[in-house]
Structure formats: structure tokens, C-alpha cells
Amino acid sequence: MKFQTLTTEELEVCSGGVAMDPAAKWIMQHESGGSPTAGHLYAQGRGDGTKGNHSSAFGAFQMINSTRKQYMGKDYQSTDLGKQYSAATKYVDQRYGSWGKAENFWKAHHWY
């Protein structure tokens, strides 16, 4: 699977002209390679016939269905990076308090 990589300028356009937090960019690159249409690697399998675990993680920040529904409402299936970033920011603020703290957690646990 190949992911699209976005430039800083493209990320700012996608996030409504607001510069994306550097820690958010770091997490996004590690979760999906920056692709707002990325499905979870394990859900898709490894490409060698191995079945995945059917995770509902999706999008640039790999949020699961229930989390996307909670923070995105009826737009939970949106591939709009701005909407995904906004929802992920709300999730991160509530769970960790900041993107920096979420990044530190990710580095320790390889998920957030």
C-alpha cells in the first residue's frame, strides 16, 4: 500500500489555513503516512494473504468508528483532512491535554 505524503502547505490548506501542530503531523505520519483515506493495516492484512483483525481505524489519524462518530457526528466517514484533524484534536485534547503529550504516549506505546 502506498500513502500520499502532503507538504506543510497542503496540510495547512486542508486544516483550514491553520498550521497543524508539529506533534499532530508526527502522529499522522506514523499512523497513516498522511493519507486521509488510509484504512488500518491490520484490517487490510499484510498483502500476503494474511487476514487482518478488522479494526475500524480509518483516516489520517486512524481513529476507530466509535471515536470518529463521537467527534465527527454524521461526518464520521469523511475523508476531509480538515475534519479529521479537527476531530482528532478534540479527542487528543480530551484524552491527553495536548498533541505533545499524545506524541509522547505514542512513542512509549506505539498507539495513542
Identify the residue ranges that each predicted region occupies:
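Extracellular/periplasmic catalytic domains that process cell-envelope and extracellular macromolecules
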Residues: V13, V18-D21, N53-S56
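Catalytic and binding regions of secreted/periplasmic enzymes and modules that target cell-wall glycans
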Residues: F58-Y112
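Active-site micro-motifs of SAM-dependent methyltransferase domains
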Residues: V13, G34, Q70
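Generic structural signal for alpha-helix termini and adjacent loop/cap motifs
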Residues: E9, G17, H30, Q94-R95
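Short, functionally critical alpha-helical segments immediately adjacent to catalytic or ligand/cofactor-binding
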Residues: M20-G45, Y85-K90, E103-K107
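N-terminal secretory leader/proregion of peptide precursors and effectors
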Residues: M1-G17
